[in-house]
Design a protein with these regions (language model features):
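Conserved non-catalytic scaffold segment of RNase H-like nuclease domains
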Residues: 1-98, 112-134
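Hydrophobic transmembrane alpha-helix bundles
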Residues: 64-67, 92, 112-119, 136-145, ...
Length: 198
């Protein structure tokens, strides 16, 4: 807990899609090798007793690496999840590099105008079943349905390709930041005041 640095995985779920359909799945509790902070236990329901006999991440790393070869890493707020997984791989002495796609960004582009784009609120807004919130399998299953809905809204993959294109400015913006807002910024030096919602 407490930011990306120092986070450890206590549970992982991977669902592999091909042409929008599930072709493989892996889920496991993970022993983080340290005490689970109380706020994480309250959020997820996962406690030290539940993970004491679970495998450590380095015991799962090769299997996860093989399962995700040639895959795009898709997650809701992908920057966080990807960096935590990548840090676990690094700690296990392995490299982990995948293309990434964020369902927060996709949803904001393809389903504009919602009050909130948190996974729970988004699922409520567009009628996606979301069981076992804050557990790996429940959140992953909900994210898969959200991603499938985004695929339906982007049949030519134009939006998805834009986000996957590393040269696109938009792929670097925070999820809440619009490219049009960036383009509208003045090009002259000076002092600027930002008010209300940054």
């Amino acid at each position: 807990g407490g930011g990306i640095k120092g986070n450890k995985i206590t549970e992982i779920c991977i669902i592999v899609l091909q042409e929008g359909k599930e072709i493989n799945r892996f889920a496991s509790l993970v022993n983080p090798g340290r005490e689970i902070p109380l706020y994480i236990e309250k959020l997820t329901g996962i406690n030290d007793r539940m993970v004491e006999d679970a495998p450590y991440f380095d015991e799962l790393a090769s299997q996860i690496d093989a399962l995700t070869q040639d895959c795009i890493f898709v997650a809701h707020n992908v920057g966080f999840d990807y960096n935590v997984v990548r840090a676990e791989f690094k700690e296990a002495g392995l490299d982990f590099n995948r293309k990434r796609l964020c369902t927060v960004r996709l949803a904001k582009k393809l389903i504009p105008g919602l009050f909130s784009y948190s996974l729970g609120n988004l699922c409520t807004s567009i009628n996606i079943p979301h069981y076992d919130r804050h557990r790996a399998t429940g959140d992953t299953e909900a994210t898969v349905i959200l991603f499938q809905r985004c695929l339906d809204l982007d049949p030519e993959y134009e939006v998805i390709q834009g986000f996957l294109n590393r040269k696109s400015k938009e792929s670097y913006f925070p999820p809440h930041f619009k490219a049009s807002d960036f383009e509208a910024l003045p090009h002259k030096a000076g002092v600027y005041f930002f008010k209300d919602k940054n």
